[in-house]
Amino acid sequence: MNFSSELLNKGNKTPAFSISIEGRDITTVLDNRLMGLTLTDNRGFEADQLDLELDDADGKIVLPRRGAVITLALGWKGQPLFPKGAFTVDEIEHTGAPDRLTIRARSADFRETLNTRREKSWHKTTVGEVVKEIAARHKLKMALGKDLSDKPVEHIDQTNESDGSFLMRLARQYGAIASVKNGNLLFIRQGQGKSATGKPLPVITITRKDGDSHRFTLADRGAYTGVIASWLHTREPAKKESTTVKRKRRTKKQKKEPEAKQGDYLVGTDENVLVLNRTYANRSNAERAAKMQWERLQRGVASFSLQLAEGRADFYTEMPVKVSGFKQPIDDAEWTITTLTHTVSPDNGFTTSLELEVRIDDFEME
């Protein structure tokens, strides 16, 4: 990567990436056009998302076809890059002037088959056999926690329910998570520190000097009746031209209402709400944050967010983390990464933000 901005160099390190589309390496083509790259790595069946913002002032960029597959590797110049998976182009937007192209892609599309409703009953079997059958049906490799494989399943029905929904329900019953990452069906206990192939992950240590900012939240699960998150579009330049193309869906298309430039999203009821301090860039992000915090409150977990000054492409969701330099109860807790956001931009270089959680039952506060 050869950004012209010296602001990208942090401690004599320069961000680097490798991008291919439909098997063709376009890293060099994008080298001087990249205005921003954001990769969000989510836990569970929520699709990972890749956003690319490119300079098209000369009008020479060819629009990618809908459904094209993008592969990404990310890291630092002079060091091995870390593969971050394959993503299907879901939405493209061209705006101007000045002309720029935004490409939005989501983790390669396993969702159509996993979202097909089925009728199935299992009787006198094990968790391992159930997960194995579903993995085989979708041509996925299986990464199953050994402590879950032999758990007995006396009887369970899948009634007019998709495999994705059924796996999530089964995972909740056994205190596990279900996810698809890079062609692997992952079914493991939360916070067990397993990779997508089921191998143990080393505990990552993060010190306070590694971060630009942090936020810790601990609340009584019964104290709040809802969560509110606010959004405000902060990047709304005047548009002379705007073209948006979305992938065709099998479901009936409905007219999309224009999104308000600002607002609040409430999950739960408004008798006694927890208001998130952060203002999000759009309604979708605010909705996701509110729902995530509400689920945390219902599960009874403490949450901790960190903005790292230097990006860590080697981090993945479900990695176990130890932190130091904060309050003692925070340092003593065993954290797990639930969401990762990698960002590359001319202004801030390569940074990584982490969302971590720990069960309140495992958290002691004097």
Region spans (language model):
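Assembly/oligomerization scaffold segments
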Residues: 1-112
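Conserved "cap/hinge" positions at secondary-structure junctions
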Residues: 74-76, 189, 325
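Short acidic, glycine/proline-rich loop/turn micro-motifs
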Residues: 114-118
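Short beta-strand-centered interaction patches in the first periplasmic/extracellular domains
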Residues: 2-5, 100-109, 146-215, 221
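An acidic/polar, Gly/Ser/Thr-rich interaction patch typically located in mid-to-C-terminal regions
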Residues: 33, 37-65, 211-366
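Short, compositionally biased
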Residues: 86-95, 120, 192-194, 334-346
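Short glycine/serine/proline-enriched coil/turn segments at secondary-structure junctions
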Residues: 79-81, 95-97, 179, 186, ...
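Amphipathic, non-transmembrane alpha-helical segments in extracytoplasmic/periplasmic proteins
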Residues: 49-53, 105, 119-143, 158-181, ...
